[in-house]
């Protein structure tokens, strides 16, 4: 009994020293450059470290026949400050995750089902493309343009992980054609012709 | 034609500026604190960014009925310097990945098949345990003791990702019982009795 | 006089550019992944950078005959954001700092008095143990299990420093036996027998 | 005299402790993830910290009427390991630095001469465009698509700085059209039509 | 039309995943060790990424015949969290930026006009001095004492960039002579004689 | 027996995954920006993690009546890559560690014996000075000018720790007066008079 008391006092003394193993995001507070402020440890529950939204395929009934379901800090507050996030890719037949970058993270992709042709282009303009089967892993270096495309006739899926809780996602077509960036500037900075730009702006809801 | 030449010269000029998007490890060279030296970009192939060793279950015919198949920089040189690595967990019925830590990385686990009870203990000594189904994700903060255990009657498997190309892996039982750490020191620093320590040293091949 | 005015105006102009040499923690505000928000520089005093709690031995009248007195950001707000913290170890005769890890930092130990046997186990399961005299220094790599034990007949003490303002401290026995982690899970993940686990839970105040 | 000797011995003693303020690159040695190995401090000269290649405009007689002159680690070995690099932009009338990213760095641009319309697109697809005059500064967050275009009738120039010694440079058109990335993959991942892709591949020297 | 709707829903779904490309500082909120909290992305405007205060020379009518105009996070909130800042140096004839350090950043200097003699001293006490012309670049490693001095007969100017949004600026003479550091301590720690110290304290407005 | 074999095979399998908990410096190889290349783990011994050079006072028979004994990576290769280093300060009566900076690290000081007046000056030119007794700790933010002076009549000593294996050490007087920096430049950048500069150059062995 006495031993227990001694030990417990030791325990509490030492525990005082132990903070911030984790920092579950308080999404209502303003972000900082290092992520969201933490909720108090006393309010943290085991379920804060679990995310259940990647268990079912995303809705691929769309123009790209594909879906990206993110589990970044905004969706999965438990990984705030831990330097990791994840997402699920679903590719229906003919599905494609269009050319895109993650400005703040490298990515590891693990194929769950189907066959996926994935690739990236380096700063030196070299092309690295591979067709992957379930269980194969591919790594995409930070910030480089890359894509994933269904290489088979059935659905394909993958889980991807990033070394940032907020990797960002910049889809090339959206960046060029789905906003108010003036057609003249798109033409001038991509060498595409105005007709092509205007057509894609039309499809993607862009203006200007 | 002239245009092409102009552009190509521009291309080569600009490409000179572009180095080290990646650093595929030269495993024959001495490591540095930041990882292995890189092989020359000209020798890098698309296959360097793909790892195929996680597609099949590891051998679980062992005392823990489980297997960890790592894809760290030493196995998957393409992720050297990119701040990420991955591994596959296989848990036969009654399988368990024993209590362990990764000294240098946080971890995200995605359940592929079966049901897994996973948990970790914080510095403040709080316990966070959850039983996960396929598609569920759990995050384990850096350096904390954690475990995974098959919660079902069939096999289970998961893919895990770390935010380091060299996360390390310290298995508690091996650290305590599978080396030459003297029994007296193990007893003195864990409060286990000598009989228990010696028995486990026997099972795990430890000495001292 | 005129010179002074010119210089002072220069001084104030330049000083505007100079912020956040330090970030004394406002412990009342929610933490962020990078530490606590700062109090305003105007409220910072010289005494904020001094900690006086390590000058006297901690209370070693307990089951481990030892004490750890931390000076982490929570106790010593002046080192918030500076990437360093410190602590004092006191070991009465037979005293031991049990097997533990710091999830977020490497550690340097400097022996003040007495003789200390210290050691750590690597990810590769190698054992590094040394007995140290006053003035000797030992370094413990981040996140690895390590311990310190009084190697002499008189009291021993040491000052330790970490390269994080919040290194964390996970004591193995407390993580396993001093909380609600179910006996079944402890047994399953450590290969200890239930009797041993229950006994240590009893001593350390654990449940389950 | 005696004082000098004492002091000099102190000096040398202390200087031994002082290494690696800088790490001038040995470009002949294999890179590491943190940069090139250093040449010995004894071989370092003041001129290693100076780069003279940005003093004159780059050659803008090309299809983009523009030039980027980099001073990255490969051109300016003195900034290896220091986390900074720089470059000069020259834009003849109608000149444009086409849509591009720097995968590993944020960028600050300072306009030297002329008028430049610069902009970037965020992950959230928002457009930030401004027309800048000499002396104005614009910052481009890491990894996002951005561009610079001559907004006047005379030549324009700028100096840009990156917070990496190897920021990388990925020019969108080159990544899509100036390599062997198959037309089918470009079409599939960008929604451009094959005719457009083939035409630009022709202009830019791409194949496939 | 339907396509557009599908795509837009995709767009918004994906955009949810995209946060914190940037973190424009809310200067009214308490700083954190990683910088200021961010204003909400919806309030961010293109002008937040532009700073116009470096376009005109600073006022050099002062004792040093020189001016430093900073664009650090406090002046240019758009670069908060981006790891970069910039400043302008103006040196009238005989102007000098006195011996100083930036405790938290390395620096790249680009000469705009005139001729500047710049130099730094390493930890190993070596001196690296060069006289620079317009367009020449010099790099100053983090934390080392350095200076810039007008080497010509006309005005000189430069733009400098730091790899921190808050590099700090410690001017040697101000640190020693323009505050309340007691003369006795200055004498004792610099080997200057008290007369010199008191004289400079007088000129620079110091006390003690 | 069979169990042991199974476990051992598991052990070796898992151990393969575990690298670079530490990186004991190979001082004969060229440094990299992240530190020295590592010696092979198989050659690492427990004594590599111990440094014995701080146990006895440094020689204070010199002009400053003080000594700094460093245990940086060059002296203590075991802490290469671990982000920490340490040193011992000895101050005879009237001893002083003159005004200096560590360009690459913050510092924690723990007083061992005697009484020490220590202080630093911030970028904002504020002075933070305290007189410390044994057991008191003071923290010095990265890169700022600071000093330690014996405040008592007997010897004093302290152990200091840095959050870098290579913190650097720039002593103000040596940087200004103990090298070839021309008197004219020292005068011009410090406002000291030439007589003072020449005198100190004479004492400290400087030229120019």
From Swiss-Prot, chains A, B, C, D, E, F:
One Pfam short name: Cupin_1
Cellular location(s): Secreted, Extracellular space, Apoplast
Binding of Mn(2+), residues: 100, 102, 107, 146
UniProt-listed CDD domains: cupin_OxOx (cd02241)
Any single GO CC term annotated in Swiss-Prot or TrEMBL for this entry: apoplast
Any GO MF annotation of the entry: manganese ion binding
Major localisation: secreted
Glycosylated residues (UniProt): 59
Disulfides per UniProt: 23-38
Tissue: Expressed during germination, and also in green shoots, etiolated seedlings and whole seedlings.
Keyword set includes Transmembrane helix: no
Note: Is the most highly expressed of the GLP genes.
Quaternary structure (record): May not form oligomer.
Function: May play a role in plant defense. Probably has no oxalate oxidase activity even if the active site is conserved.
Name of the molecule in the record: Germin-like protein subfamily 3 member 1
Taxonomic lineage from the root: Eukaryota, Viridiplantae, Streptophyta, Embryophyta, Tracheophyta
């Amino acid at each position: 009994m006495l031993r227990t008391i001694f030990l417990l006092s030791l325990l509490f003394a030492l525990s005082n020293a132990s903070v911030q193993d984790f920092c579950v995001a308080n999404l209502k507070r303003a972000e900082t450059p290092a992520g969201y402020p933490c909720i108090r440890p006393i309010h943290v529950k085991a379920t804060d470290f679990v995310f259940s939204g990647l268990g079912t395929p995303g809705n691929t009934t769309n123009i790209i026949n594909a879906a990206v379901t993110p589990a970044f800090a905004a969706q999965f507050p438990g990984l705030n400050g831990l330097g990791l996030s994840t997402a699920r890719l679903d590719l229906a037949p003919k599905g494609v995750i269009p050319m895109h970058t993650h400005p703040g993270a490298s990515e590891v992709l693990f194929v769950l089902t189907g066959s996926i042709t994935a690739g990236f282009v380096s700063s030196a303009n070299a092309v690295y493309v591979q067709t992957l089967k379930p269980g194969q892993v591919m790594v995409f270096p930070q910030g480089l343009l890359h894509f994933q495309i269904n290489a088979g006739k059935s659905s394909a899926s993958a889980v991807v992980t990033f070394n940032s809780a907020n990797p960002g996602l910049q889809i090339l077509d959206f960046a060029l054609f789905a906003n108010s960036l003036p057609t003249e500037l798109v033409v001038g900075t991509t060498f595409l012709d105005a007709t092509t730009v205007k057509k894609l702006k039309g499809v993607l809801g862009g203006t200007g």
